[in-house]
């Protein structure tokens, strides 16, 4: 599956993307300073290659009828990162699909990682999220959420530009480089 908007393409993973993931999770890790930097994510090339190959194998035969939870982002022919979605519960905490009980209210929550730093500041992230939101709207989603931390000013600006409004703030949720930051959740009615 592939969706295009302006200079952005959201698409399913290609086998050639595996080596990008290996690089992004082992050597070119600057993006990790902005995506939950309190979590340890560094790995070795062999582990990442095996993991992403397994993921690719599990996803490559997916029918276009299946609503995607993740797309790769391409800008001007370059694989630059991904958008993804996950569920959060009524307290805005991550919850597995398997943990959701009948009748439980959950929130469709989206995120983005632009791993190629030469693309930062060129609106690729804004356009990719706008396209992902439209995809979910076309698949029946009425409201969508995104989460970040108060130190990620660029993501906050993108969320606000797209019309998200802050709906939850968890005080002093994270420590990054010796400073404490709040956890933020934003909501958008679509």
Region locations from a protein language model:
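GNAT-family acyltransferases
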Residues: 1-117, 179-190
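Amphipathic alpha-helical recognition patches that constitute DNA-binding helices
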Residues: 20, 109, 127-128, 143, ...
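Conserved beta-strand-loop-alpha-helix junction that forms the acyl-donor binding cleft
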Residues: 115, 146-156
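PDZ/PDZ-like domain micro-motif
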Residues: 118-119, 174
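Conserved acetyl-CoA-binding loop-helix of GNAT-fold acetyltransferases
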Residues: 121-135, 153-161
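Conserved catalytic-core motifs of GNAT/GCN5-like acyltransferases
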Residues: 145-148, 165-182
């Amino acid at each position: 599956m592939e969706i295009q908007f302006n200079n952005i393409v959201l698409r399913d993973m290609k086998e050639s993307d595996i080596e990008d993931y290996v690089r992004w999770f082992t050597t070119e890790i600057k993006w990790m300073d902005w995506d939950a930097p309190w979590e340890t994510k560094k790995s070795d090339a062999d582990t990442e290659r095996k993991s992403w190959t397994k993921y690719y194998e599990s996803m490559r035969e997916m029918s276009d009828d299946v609503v995607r939870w993740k797309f790769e982002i391409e800008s001007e022919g370059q694989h630059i990162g991904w958008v993804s979605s996950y569920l959060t519960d009524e307290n805005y905490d991550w919850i597995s699909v398997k943990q959701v009980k009948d009748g439980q209210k959950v929130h469709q929550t989206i995120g983005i990682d632009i791993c190629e730093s030469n693309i930062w500041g060129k609106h690729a992230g804004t356009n990719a999220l706008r396209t992902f939101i439209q995809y979910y709207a076309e698949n029946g989603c009425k409201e969508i959420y995104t989460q970040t931390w108060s130190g990620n000013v660029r993501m906050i600006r993108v969320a606000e530009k797209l019309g998200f409004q802050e709906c939850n703030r968890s005080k002093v949720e994270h420590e990054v480089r010796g400073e404490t930051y709040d956890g933020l959740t934003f909501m958008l009615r679509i």
